[in-house]
Design a protein with these regions (language model features):
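Accessory terminal and edge-of-domain segments that mediate assembly/interaction
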Residues: 1-32, 40-191
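Acidic-aromatic/histidine active-site loop/patch
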Residues: 37
Length: 191
């Protein structure tokens, strides 16, 4: 089973909020806490949305190819929640989609889709997508049209594409292909 909690980040009483979340997690016998978020980045909208993940759990680091959580600085409720999870020995992962900063107004269905696909990998479950794939395509087409109308933005997007294409090789490892095929088979059983 999956328990979803959606809401606005609280402005105060973070410790109380965290206690309530962890109390609910204990009551429901949650085996892992996964938080999702988005951050503005210099990613072009024309490429797959990068999803990064972090954890302080050494086992999860290796299992899901995540980064060690080593951030120091101002934090939000996600940082407080993950620190509490670590204290109470509840495995936790934080996943973040990189949204192009030049179209940072929510919603961003393409980023949502990228996060859902990562959740499928982490939890090893198929997630019904409904209209999300079509919404992500429509979002990208809409941003394409906006960029075409402004030559300065179009040039900027091309620069971002070139930078991204030269720094990242396409993911075509055997493991990535197998993971995508497994996702396809699971989705066929859900749809």
């Amino acid at each position: 089973d999956v328990v979803l909690i959606q809401g606005i980040e609280p402005n105060m009483r973070w410790q109380q909020f965290t206690r309530e979340i962890l109390g609910l997690a204990a009551e429901l016998e949650v085996s892992m806490v996964v938080t999702l978020g988005a951050l503005l980045s210099d990613s072009p909208h024309t490429r797959p949305v990068p999803v990064t993940g972090s954890t302080s759990d050494p086992t999860l680091l290796e299992t899901y190819a995540l980064e060690a959580s080593n951030y120091e600085g101002p934090t939000g409720i996600v940082g407080v929640l993950h620190e509490a999870c670590q204290r109470f020995e509840v495995p936790s992962i934080s996943l973040w989609a990189a949204v192009p900063h030049y179209v940072g107004q929510p919603p961003c269905p393409k980023a949502t889709l990228a996060l859902v696909r990562k959740i499928e990998d982490v939890l090893d479950i198929p997630v019904p997508l409904g209209d999300l794939v079509e919404e992500a395509r429509a979002w990208e087409v809409g941003v394409d049209e906006l960029a075409e109308d402004d030559e300065e933005v179009a040039d900027y997007v091309r620069q971002l594409e070139q930078a991204r294409d030269t720094t990242e090789l396409p993911e075509a490892s055997g493991e990535a292909i197998a993971r995508e095929f497994e996702r396809y088979l699971k989705r066929r059983n859900v749809d």
